[in-house]
Each structure stands twice: as structure tokens, then as C-alpha cells.
């Protein structure tokens, strides 16, 4: 059976190794008007897909993330099912946004930006990784 996440990771690494940063950004920009959407996700799923994978790019290139309101909209559709899909266990912790009115989970509050929360719940970063980066910003 094919693991899509593994495939996507390999494809992204390949593209990054053969394309310039400008080419990668242009590739994303030319797809903005593409009518494709993830199966079963509708418009909200398409937005989530683009924001999450857009963060994969902006984080790697050190660029500004999408606006907080856009990320919050994606977070609004997130919950236990998403955590399970990505293999994330909050383990008695609650993620609380510092830049929007949003939280997920129960337990000890962990205060993070909406961007960092989305990176955590999609298993792009761990709580210790984003907590350390937040401390460095203080």
C-alpha cells in the first residue's frame, strides 16, 4: 500500500532539490486559481489544504505565514479527528492561541501563535519545538 505522506515528502524534497526558491513560489502562485479540492473537504478542505501546505513552503523559506484570520479559519475545522489523523497526542495539554480566540484540548494550557498551533496539530512541529521558538522571541 502506498503511503501518501511519504510520497508527498519525497516529491517535495525532490522539487526543492531541482527548483529555485523563485520557481517553487511561482509553482504555488500559478495554482491559486486551480479548481481542484480535496475529496470530501469542500471549500473548507481546499483552504485547509492550501494553508497547511503553504506553511510547509513559507516555513522552509523563512517567509511570512498567511494572515492569522485565515489560519484561525482552518483551526476552526480542526479537532480530535485531525489530531488522530496526524498522530498527535496533546497528552493533557490545551493549545491556546495567543493571537486569536481559539483553543483545543483539555489540561495544562500551552500558549502559542495560531501558526504554531497549526504546525503542531498537523505534526509539522512538536510542542517543544514551537515552545522553544516562542521563548526565543520574548
Each predicted region: which residue ranges?
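Structured surface interface patches that mediate subunit assembly and partner/cofactor docking
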Residues: 1-6, 16, 22-138
Amino acid at each position: 500500500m502506498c503511503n501518501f505522506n511519504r510520497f508527498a515528502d519525497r516529491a517535495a524534497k525532490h522539487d526543492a532539490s531541482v527548483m529555485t526558491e523563485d520557481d517553487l513560489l511561482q509553482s504555488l502562485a500559478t495554482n491559486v486559481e486551480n479548481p481542484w479540492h480535496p475529496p470530501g473537504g469542500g471549500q473548507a478542505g481546499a483552504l485547509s489544504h492550501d494553508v497547511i501546505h503553504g506553511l510547509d513552503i513559507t516555513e522552509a523559506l523563512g517567509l511570512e505565514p498567511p494572515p492569522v484570520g485565515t489560519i484561525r479559519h482552518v483551526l476552526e475545522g480542526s479537532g480530535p479527528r485531525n489530531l488522530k489523523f496526524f498522530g498527535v497526542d496533546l497528552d493533557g495539554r490545551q493549545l491556546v492561541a495567543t493571537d486569536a480566540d481559539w483553543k483545543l484540548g483539555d489540561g495544562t494550557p500551552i500558549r502559542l501563535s495560531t501558526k504554531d498551533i497549526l504546525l503542531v496539530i498537523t505534526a509539522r512541529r512538536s510542542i517543544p519545538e514551537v515552545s522553544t521558538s516562542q521563548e526565543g522571541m520574548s
